[in-house]
Amino acid sequence: MRVAYRHFQPVTVFYARGVGPYGQSAQHAWGAMVSWLDQHQARKRVKQAFGLFRDNPNTTAADLVRYDACIPVMLDADFPPAPGIGRQTLPGGAYAVHTHVGSYDELGGLLSHLHSRIVPERALCVDYDRPFMTVHLNDPAVTREVHRRTEVCVPVVPIAMPLPRNDAGRHAPDTAALARRLARAG
């Protein structure tokens, strides 16, 4: 599995939340998001979308697992608020990223493999304070399933790498520098 390391900047998004097992909650959230975009004739303006996996399905009851379907806030968007559509800022930081081409049905297995096997093998630790996510790079409405490109992203921190010091002499994380180090080491 090819894995790159990337530092994501925080981004403000519109989101729709689905609750329940990930297969069902993702379908519900994307249905609500696409419906809202279509109401405003805005779907074609979306160039990238994010799927956020908020909970660990192994430790959270299935009916409480949360999934957020997200699109970046467009600067000229003057859409009125709608029930079920919120606004939030995705946290930035370092992520281990695998680019998948093909069916969305494979994303859960890829996230699990990246999380449980690849990240530990590369001396990284998962940052459970940030969500696992997928970055959807094309529109499934116009892209054949075999050509759909999705980045599968697991938030990471190093296990054994010195952190830079801040002004007070305490260790302070610098995730941009971390991402550069990881990219060189990868």
Each language-model region and where it sits:
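A solvent-exposed interaction/effector surface
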Residues: M1-G186
